[in-house]
Amino acid sequence: MEIILKQDVQNLGFKDDVVSVKPGYGRNFLIPQGFATLATPSAKKVLAENLKQRAHKEAKIVADAKALAETLKALEIKLTAKAGGEKLFGSITNIDIAEALEKSGNAIDRKFITSGVVKRIGKYNATVRLHRDVIVELPYEIVAEK
């Protein structure tokens, strides 16, 4: 079954992508939740027309995302957490990284930050998806609270 995504769906695709999914997934989840519409020939034609009109806007969005990526690469993020030795009491997740980015003046939604759950002190990398074509590795360090 082919569908057109109305918004980004993790592990499936981005907004306005035409993707093939199993019929049950599309009919019972994606379409009722408003994440997708059925990819009929007329819907594909309308999508192609809309994408053509948005092509010039897309170039500006990609340029802005690349500029933000360069800013993020230059950032040094230090997160503090309570720890006993090398092990944290609790964990650091993408929510904590998003809050640290917001404090530095670069607000990015936590959904676009991918990092595992970190439970030890040290240096790590998070993946930030700014655009479908712009993905940046964000280094961060976790230090113990004093």
From Swiss-Prot:
Keywords: Ribonucleoprotein, Ribosomal protein, RNA-binding, rRNA-binding. The keyword Phosphoprotein does not apply. SUPFAM superfamilies: L9 N-domain-like, Ribosomal protein L9 C-domain. InterPro entries: Ribosomal_bL9, Ribosomal_bL9/RNase_H1_N, Ribosomal_bL9_bac/chp, Ribosomal_bL9_C, Ribosomal_bL9_C_sf, Ribosomal_bL9_N, Ribosomal_bL9_N_sf. It comes from the Bacteria. Gene3D superfamilies: Ribosomal protein L9, C-terminal domain (3.10.430.100), Ribosomal protein L9, N-terminal domain (3.40.5.10). One of its GO terms (cellular component) is ribosome. Pfam families: Ribosomal_L9_C, Ribosomal_L9_N. Binds to the 23S rRNA. Belongs to the bacterial ribosomal protein bL9 family. This is Large ribosomal subunit protein bL9. It comes from Flavobacterium johnsoniae (strain ATCC 17061 / DSM 2064 / JCM 8514 / BCRC 14874 / CCUG 350202 / NBRC 14942 / NCIMB 11054 / UW101).
